[in-house]
Structure formats: C-alpha cells, structure tokens
Amino acid sequence: MAAAVLGQLGALWIHNLRSRGRLAWGVLPQSYVHTSASLDISRKWEKKNKIVYPPQLPGEPRRPAEIYHCRRQIKYSKDKMWYLAKLIRGMSIDQALAQLEFNDKKGAKIIKEVLLEAQDMAVRDHNVEFRSNLYIAESTSGRGQYLKRIRYHGRGRFGIMERVYCHYFVKLVEGPPPPPEPPKMAVAHAKEYIQQLRSRTIIHTL
C-alpha cells in the first residue's frame, strides 16, 4: 500500500515538472554540472585587451598601446617561473628575448614563446608600428590547477603527490623602457618608517 502511494506521488511530481517546462541540461545552472576546470579560469587578464579608452584631446600626447597576454596550465613550478619572470621585468622586448635565448631553463623557452606571441599580437591587433618599440611592464607567474596523483611505494603502500601547474602573465607597453629606479638607502627607509609611526591614529576616537 505504501509503495503504491509513493509511486503515485512520484508520478504526480514528474507530471508537475513536465507541465512547468521541459528540463534540459543546457538550461541547468553551471554549479550543478561538474565543470571545475572551466570555472577556475576567469580570463580576466585577456579581457584587459578589450578596454576602450575615451577619445584624446587635440595636442594631447598619444596614449601608448598596452598588450596583455598569458599562457595557462604550464607544466612547471610557479616559483621557478617567478625567477625568470622577474629577470626580464622592465627590459625592452629585444633585450628580454636575448636574455631568455641563452638561458637553459625550461621556463625560459616557454616565456620566450609567450613574448613572441605577444609581439605578433601587438603588431596585428594593437596598431603598433615597430615590433622592437615595446618593453615588459609587468611579468609574473601564478599558481595553476594542481592535480592529485598516486605515488606507489613498496610493500603495497602508496602516497598522494601533486602535479604542479602554473600560469604566466605578461604586459607589454609601447615605447622605450623607463630608467631603473635607484635603490633606497637606509636613511630613506628610516624616514618612511618614522612617517608611518607619526601618521598613526587611535581607532574608535574622535
């Protein structure tokens, strides 16, 4: 008796769903479907190429072109990639390619490929006249999506290891590279520290 009642209730529930509208996988929210790989990548870095600035006034200096490019899910450590990314930061595009050409690390070849792709993108999509008139304004690495795998041990035992991946991001700006900033001396650091102490305020007071 109870099974018959439950069967009738289930049939009524399905009938109500069908009367409201047919459900399809395409209209279900993405959170109900296992799409973790697609949800992790927001593509915010590449969207910066689509920023439209307001028109410039007559006589105003021309705004330099900015090119954002990246490569994701590189089979390489983010810490090893960071050292190479920091190496070319602030260099011209030709100088950076020359430095990476004579570096025997695996990440150097990857960064060189990304820089060449960004250089072609600058000429093709961003109206840059000279390929060499670019410098690396930003260059950094980020943590990718790690994958857990089984590491087999002796005597039938095992452990969990991670296959590491990283992202590499670069921003090219049209024009000559800016002069390097001189390193701060101890006196300058001390003055900044004293100024921070003097500018402190007492919270929850007038």
Curated annotation (Swiss-Prot):
Q: Which InterPro entries match?
A: Ribosomal_uL22, Ribosomal_uL22_bac/org-type, Ribosomal_uL22_sf
Q: Which UniProt keywords apply?
A: Mitochondrion, Ribonucleoprotein, Ribosomal protein, Transit peptide
Give the UniProt record's GO annotations in the biological process aspect: translation
Q: Where in the cell is it found?
A: Mitochondrion
Q: Which GO terms describe its cellular component?
A: mitochondrial large ribosomal subunit; mitochondrion
Residues annotated as transmembrane? none
- UniProt key word Ribonucleoprotein: yes
Q: Does the keyword Transcription regulation apply?
A: no
Source organism, top-level taxon: Eukaryota
In Gene Ontology terms, what is one molecular function of this protein?
Answer: structural constituent of ribosome
Transit peptide residue numbers: 1-40
SUPFAM superfamilies named among the record's database cross-references? Ribosomal protein L22 (SSF54843)
Q: How does it assemble?
A: Component of the mitochondrial ribosome large subunit (39S) which comprises a 16S rRNA and about 50 distinct proteins.
Name the family. Answer: Belongs to the universal ribosomal protein uL22 family.
Identify this protein by name. Large ribosomal subunit protein uL22m
Name the gene for this chain: MRPL22
